[in-house]
């Protein structure tokens, strides 16, 4: 086995988590995130295409994509928690997300998930975060 193969076997991507902080009103709190794998990303993208049957006019729903990324890749807090949804008076994770976070906070969390999923320039910083 090559050194790269050994590294990849010893460092599977299914157990990576990273704690991050956002700015503004949430600067004192940590969110725990997990990266997206290729299958998840493909599924989210397919769910976010508007007019999928129309060959001429297809649109991508960025807001829905960000919501799916955050709901499914933020470990803490858990936006799928039924007790939290009930206490917030909502029925879905999407409704909870939009009740407790601002649009920019949702976008920022989605961006952070994308970064730890291998998209972005700061791979050295992410490697340090993963080690901690």
Region spans (language model):
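Low-complexity intrinsically disordered segments
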Residues: 1-13, 123-132
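A general, composition-driven signal for non-globular sequence regions
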Residues: 13-15, 57-58
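Short acidic-hydrophobic surface loop/beta-edge motif
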Residues: 14-27
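Long, low-complexity, highly charged intrinsically disordered regions that are enriched for acidic
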Residues: 15, 33-35
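Short, surface-exposed, charged amphipathic helix/loop patches that serve as local interaction elements
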Residues: 29, 36-132
């Amino acid at each position: 086995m090559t050194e790269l193969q050994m590294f990849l076997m010893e460092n599977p991507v299914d157990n990576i988590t990273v704690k991050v902080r956002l700015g503004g009103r949430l600067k004192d709190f940590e969110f725990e995130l997990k990266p997206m794998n290729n299958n998840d990303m493909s599924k989210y993208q397919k769910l976010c295409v508007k007019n999928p049957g129309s060959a001429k006019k297809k649109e991508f729903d960025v807001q829905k994509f960000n919501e799916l990324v955050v709901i499914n890749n933020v470990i803490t807090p858990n936006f799928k928690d039924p007790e939290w949804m009930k206490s917030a008076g909502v029925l879905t994770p999407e409704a909870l997300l939009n009740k407790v976070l601002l649009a920019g906070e949702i976008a920022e969390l989605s961006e952070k998930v994308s970064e730890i999923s291998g998209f972005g320039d700061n791979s050295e910083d992410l490697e340090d975060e993963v080690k901690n």
